[in-house]
Amino acid sequence: MVDKLTHLKQLEAESIHIIREVAAEFDNPVMLYSIGKDSAVMLHLARKAFFPGKLPFPVMHVDTQWKFQEMYRFRDKMVEEMGLELITHVNPEGVAQGINPFTHGSSKHTDIMKTQGLKQALDKHGFDAAFGGARRDEEKSRAKERVYSFRDSKHRWDPKNQRPELWNVYNGKVNKGESIRVFPLSNWTELDIWQYIYLEGIPIVPLYFAAEREVIEKNGTLIMIDDERILEHLSEEEKARIVKKKVRFRTLGCYPLTGAVESEAETLTDIIQEMLLTRTSERQGRVIDHDGAGSMEDKKRQGYF
């Protein structure tokens, strides 16, 4: 009986139902894999949904080439251990133009390497449904997004042209060229995610745990020195301000656009305790969310995750 399930078990059952529904309803679904904690939980739920069989769809990473090195190592390890069918896509036009977050800024870099890259990959493989790990508690534009988020033939999201979702009934009807973005974790919170990771023993990128790391403060955000490329874009005065601090990440993206937070949380229980006390959004460290008022909604209207 549903009323005997714990809060997390109810969320788990809802997410598994959504994942199975998509697998049964759509011709060519794909699971977007950004390597972060939400992707880890979503992938775990998908494997549970079809256990002991394999996933009936591939996972796809839209690579900007600016993720943390630990994220790439973790991705490759998980793919090998789980036997996943991984598709990686890098926007060739962005690479040819040398697009990067330093020279071109966060907005242009995100649009070309993430949004346009995603649209290219979806078109190339003809996917009609794409799972994403977004949650409604993350950000205000995501709070009004449906579980089945309808996208037109150009992958655009129109918040005024979405379908009603009553109880657990979802309308997946699409015409040729249209698609659905599916968010099985819509009703989860950041705390739910961490508690589930703890209870299920889900592996995550070590960057989520506090450790001594080299960082530089830029515009009030602690940016980690992840590889040599960032040094090419720092002045000598800025290089002199590089310090070691005990930090961790609440959210992961392109490393020059993702801020760390000072923390002592070295274990999952520490992180959960920290989440119980925090009053700030996990996305406060995402530079792309501060490009302008309504910037996330604008990005989603153009086809962003």
Swiss-Prot record:
MF-aspect GO terms: ATP binding; sulfate adenylyltransferase (ATP) activity
EC number: 2.7.7.4
Keyword Coiled coil part of the UniProt annotation: no
Enzyme class, broadest EC rank: transferase
GO biological process, one term: hydrogen sulfide biosynthetic process
CDD domains for this protein: Sulfate_adenylyltransferase_2 (cd23946)
InterPro entries reported in the protein's UniProt record: PAPS_reduct_dom (IPR002500), Rossmann-like_a/b/a_fold (IPR014729), SO4_adenylTrfase_ssu (IPR011784), Sulfate_adenylyltrnsfr_sub2 (IPR050128)
Record key words, sorted: ATP-binding, Nucleotide-binding, Nucleotidyltransferase, Transferase
Catalytic reaction annotation: sulfate + ATP + H(+) = adenosine 5'-phosphosulfate + diphosphate
Family: Belongs to the PAPS reductase family. CysD subfamily.
Functional note: With CysN forms the ATP sulfurylase (ATPS) that catalyzes the adenylation of sulfate producing adenosine 5'-phosphosulfate (APS) and diphosphate, the first enzymatic step in sulfur assimilation pathway. APS synthesis involves the formation of a high-energy phosphoric-sulfuric acid anhydride bond driven by GTP hydrolysis by CysN coupled to ATP hydrolysis by CysD.
PANTHER family: SULFATE ADENYLYLTRANSFERASE SUBUNIT 2
Name of the featured protein: Sulfate adenylyltransferase subunit 2
Species for this entry: Pseudomonas putida (strain W619)
Native organism taxonomy: Bacteria, Pseudomonadati, Pseudomonadota, Gammaproteobacteria, Pseudomonadales
